[in-house]
Amino acid sequence: MSKKAEAWMKKRGWTPQRFQCDAWNALGAQRQGIVNALTGSGKTYSILLPYLFDLHQSKSKSPLQCIWITPIKALAKEIQSAAQRVIDECQLPIRVGIRTGDTEGKERQRQQKAWPNILITTPESLHLIFCKKKNTDIWSALQLLVVDEWHELMGSKRGVQMELALAHLRHLRPQVLVWGISATIGNLHEALHVLLGPAHAAKGELIQSSIIKRTEVIPIQPDKPERMPWAGHLGIHLLPKLLPILRESQSTLIFTNVRSQCEIWYRSLMEAAPDLAGTTAIHHGSISKEIRDWVESSLHAGKLHCVICTSSLDLGVDFAPVETIVQIGGPKGIARFMQRAGRSGHSPDGKSRIYFLPTHSLELIECAALQLGLQQGELEKREPYIQCFDVLIQWLVTLGCGDGFRPEDVLESIRATHCYQHIQDDEFLWCLNFAAAKGTSLHEYPEYHKIQPIDGLWLVNNQRIARRHRMSIGTIVSDTLVAVRMRGAGLLGHIEESFIAQLHEGDAFWFAGMSVELMELKELTAKVKKSKRTDGRSPVWLGGSLPLTSKMSHLIRQKIEEASESAPTPSQDPIIQFIRPIFNLQAERSHIPNTREMLIEQFESEDGYHTMFYPFEGKFVHEGLAALIAHRIGEQKPMSFSIATNDYGFELLSNKVIEVHADLVRHWFRVDHLERDLLAGVNGAELAGRQFRDIATIAGLLFKGYPGQPIRDRHLQSSAQLLFRVFQDYDVDNLLIRQSYNELVYRQFDILRMRDALDRILSAEIIITRPDRPTPFAFPILVDRLRERMSSESLKERIAQMTIAWTS
């Protein structure tokens, strides 16, 4: 097997890597597992070549022999090109097809008449095939299942979708081989276990590349740190420093963490350097497929000089011409940063160069922490989901839409997954009955009777239910989307209803890198025209924040310790030396904590009495901690608080002085009754109800409407709230309610990480200072609180006033 693949690679002037040879040999021996290697090192060919040269059987009774799963549609084209390159050069009798949400209807029909030998698809599109009648015949010659970018899927419910699909196909075709491809992940052995399932994981192969890719991280800094705002606006003030880098590079990807940042940066870049307009583009998941395709192909052809993007270009789409990567703001995790850095030097021996542009000066600490993390070579884990009853209910209806199922067969199949390996008989029976609306509070409503037993086979026997289910398959839940159509130019993309509903006809806003004016909003279609106005708003999407990983939190605390009074020697890190004036001011007014200390500051301003806590655990954990501590303080002495958080700490603002001393702090941060007090502090029922909306959508309780007739977001929300109250009051054993609280506690607030943080704080020395004015650590948190209730212009004025008053 290796000889054929090796000969083809040598013909192209490539040298096979050791991990590629190991993968070829493993497939030749009919083994399965995960290939783990860096971006651009040849992971795709490590699995693809063995199939093309040896595993493919030209005389098979069914053409479909290999399914290649990708988490993003953009990657499908690249995989198809990689396969087609070999097929054309070697004249192999193999057909490759793509089936995603973007595939045209005619192509889908052609595929159903004659399936390709290799089908490249997404988890959702694969599940749609399971909805087809007689779909069992499609898999009759299946030999190979490949899950690309497995690290992206594993920590999400899309990963659970894949677990169910893999277990089902294995049940139908026990001899099928399963392989995962992963670039960057910390818990590889667990990833292998989740991919292959408990029965096969022990014999799975973990093939890792020994290639160490050089990564150069370069911070973009102002001339003096005093010129950098302590709580800036997206780093735009450093644009003059970025422009020379863009002009010197042949091609650049500028990564932002969220789509709204992406739009603002494109707009700012065009205003600052209009000469770049013809060679600069924008790319994110809400822009239309046509625009994204054009950007990708133009970048690949070397026609674009710069692309501002989000994680939509994180993954392995092969853009070899990319020379430089820029990261705007902290990426919040080492693995994500490495993934993005790997987009440059996208070849096994290429060197990655990534510039770090901070949005405010303290964020430079993240750059120093990332450099340390890259040196240590440790990556974050992806925590897999377990007991996702919403996904299981959707899966039962999917099987019912297709060839039907027998419960005993499905139970055996799902127990072969990591997610459901410990599911109890009564839990499975509850899900089965819930999908049939048996014995539940929904029994009187026909639309919830989705499946029913017919001669021992459970089926969907209603075409309307089947059609609505096919339209709802998936686990990605977002706000209702509004199509944005340009007059005379077609679809630009989609914006969430919650943003567009705030606009009036004639208002300007920025989208897809251009200023447009809203002409009409009708039936969730926004008709727009080009506008010359530059004062339009930038859209905001829900879910627009990334949590700081626990590993990054630990590294940040280490770098801060280097600047503390307890550091044995002055830090030699150039970044720490550069922002030394800020640390000096922090030390002068308060204290710089080491890793064995917990800093608390108290001061008074015209807004009230501020108590600042600095665990350095990330914004998501701080939101939970702030609510927890506020609740526990309020139990002792009733008072109201305003809460603000960022990645470094949180603020409790009150109209009364809070008594603070070390014993009280340890009482507030105690671990006992953590879940009870947390849910009380955050109004757990209210937040669990919001979590329930997503769960109810996945489980098929909420239907978002037909094409052209979408159901508005507020109606979906009210329906979800009604169902939540009904289940809580009349269905005490409802597993979806239980799941809502579990996801709130274990996912949103990450109670396990919070418990670790509490343990660390309890063992730390409590340092309490009372500065006469806010400190550099406090200032960004204060600004975040003001940002919630002030316009951007008013906020800029207030920041300027505060900076003058508090730095004098």
Task: List each model region and its residues.
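Long C-terminal interaction/binding lobes of large macromolecular proteins
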Residues: 297, 334-336, 344-364, 374-378, ...
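Extended, highly charged accessory segments
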Residues: 411-481, 495, 539, 547-808
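Short, well-ordered loop/turn sites that connect or cap secondary structure elements
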Residues: 476-478, 503, 510
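A conserved acidic, glycine/proline-rich C-terminal tail/linker
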Residues: 489-508
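Short beta-strand-centered aromatic/proline hotspots
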Residues: 514-521
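Short, solvent-exposed secondary-structure boundary/capping segments
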Residues: 522-539
